UniProtKB/Swiss-Prot annotation:
Its EC number is 2.5.1.19. This is 3-phosphoshikimate 1-carboxyvinyltransferase. Pfam families: EPSP_synthase (PF00275). InterPro entries: Enolpyruvate_Tfrase_dom (IPR001986), Enolpyruvate_Tfrase_sf (IPR036968), EPSP_synthase (IPR006264), EPSP_synthase_CS (IPR023193), RNA3'P_cycl/enolpyr_Trfase_a/b (IPR013792).
Length: 424
């Protein structure tokens, strides 16, 4: 993909951004917790979430599409499949299904593409095994394919050493089908699972970063939901408005969950003019985000990292356009995402002439003028999109840009809508 320099301000209202990926995954998986059809409007039809929907179908659900609505009718009982459950490039799918299937009667095999099958899964497998699940795979169940022999678990208490929505969600799903649990983490991670379970009628109590969950004695209520726009996807265009002088963007109908808008608040700390307007929300807070261009200043970021881990590469682009040297710390998880996002982000910035260096758990970036470069995305959709945004300032050629479709299939069309010249 080739992005040319944008020589004019961005002035646009965006309403058709990618639907939220985290919510879409959960809508598909959590529909299995009910005995009635779930109605999901604006489901994200991207590679990762379509794989999740395919797995739900393989486990026995019937899926109908009526325009923008997906209707998911769950089976009476989750089926034992006679095929491998393919998660594609989605770590979220694999880790959440690990928890769900760990408590089901049957034998299940989860696998993914060559990139996902290299990513570490022990961070979820080990906690599940510690509470009684039977999971096996290569490298002591650290890499897929993963084999799961499901069974009902005893009630458990688990204090997670890391704040991770995927660890938390996997354990809660396993506990829901078993005998319940008590769970805690060092700080609150994304809380979509707790909110959606509560909205469906699960007996769940939350206090800060602690959760008490009772087992599911009867099926939960079905979902009836309009999936909001994804703040992580929308963030690329927030950064674009912050680095292209005199720009003004309104991002419509965006998920405003506090655990998902931390990156926007970092931009505010850097001097960005950003306003939030809450409008509605059944399971979650939803509204609009308005961004006007303002000069950015350097910042140090070391808290609530689990709330902005997906936005870190795009945040690095904002750092590169700020006055001074910015630092991101306590983000070691970036090294085990779709690629080593610390190393790849820093290498890409250096190729563009930006002074940047790796830290063990983050990166340091000094703002300066960037130059056009050829960037290898390493098959990481967020790396590709982040450097596409930087390309609006200096031009950019991005290799393996096809992976953008795993989360944001209309990203290029929105780039063109804001005035960019893009060659696929």
């Amino acid at each position: 993909m080739k992005v040319r320099i944008l020589n004019e301000p961005i002035n646009v209202e965006l309403s058709r951004i990618a639907a939220d990926k985290s919510i879409s995954h959960r809508c598909a998986i959590f529909s299995l917790l009910s005995d009635k059809p779930s109605h999901v409007r604006n489901y994200l039809k991207a590679g990762d979430t379509l794989n999740t929907l395919d797995i739900v179908r393989t486990l026995g659900a019937q899926i109908q599409e009526r325009g923008e609505e997906v209707i998911i009718t769950p089976p009476e009982k989750i089926l034992e499949p006679d095929v491998v459950l393919e998660c594609g490039n989605s770590g979220t799918s694999m880790r959440l299904f690990m928890g769900l299937l760990a408590a089901q009667d049957g034998f299940f095999v989860l696998s993914g593409d060559k990139y996902l099958n290299r990513r570490p899964m022990a961070r979820v497998a080990k906690p599940l095994v510690a509470v009684g699940a039977k999971i096996d795979g290569a490298n002591e169940a650290n890499t897929a394919p993963l084999c799961i022999r499901g069974k009902k678990l005893e009630r458990f208490k688990y204090d997670s050493p890391v704040a991770s929505a995927q660890v938390k969600s996997a354990l809660l799903l396993a506990a829901l089908y078993s005998n319940g649990c008590e769970f805690s983490e060092p700080e609150l991670s994304r809380d979509h699972t707790e909110r959606m379970l509560k909205g469906m009628g699960a007996k769940i109590k939350t206090q800060g970063a602690s959760i008490a969950l009772e087992p599911m004695s009867t099926p939960l209520a079905p979902l009836d939901i309009d999936v909001p726009n994804d703040p992580s996807s929308a963030f690329f265009f927030a950064v674009a408005a912050c680095i292209i002088p005199n720009s003004h963007i309104v991002l419509k109908n965006v998920l405003l969950n506090e655990t998902r808008i931390e990156a926007y608040k970092i931009l505010q700390k850097m001097g960005a003019d950003i306003k939030f307007k809450e409008i509605s929300g059944k399971y979650e807070s939803i509204g609009d985000i308005e961004i006007r261009y303002a000069a950015l200043n350097a910042v140090e970021v070391s808290e609530n990292i689990s709330w902005l881990i997906d936005e870190a590469p795009a945040l690095a682009i904002a750092f590169a356009n700020a006055k001074g040297t910015s630092v991101l710390k306590n983000a070691k998880e970036l090294r085990v995402k779709e690629c080593d996002r610390i190393a790849v982000t820093v290498a890409g910035l250096k190729k563009c002439g930006i002074k940047a260096r790796e830290l063990e758990d983050g990166f340091e970036v000094s703002g300066s003028d960037a130059s056009c470069a050829i960037i290898d995305s390493h098959g990481d959709h967020r790396i590709a999109m982040s450097f596409a945004v930087l390309g609006l300032k200096c031009g950019m050629i991005i290799e393996k840009s096809e992976f953008i479709a795993t989360s944001f299939p209309n990203f290029v069309s929105i780039l063109r809508k804001i005035g960019a010249s893009v060659e696929d």
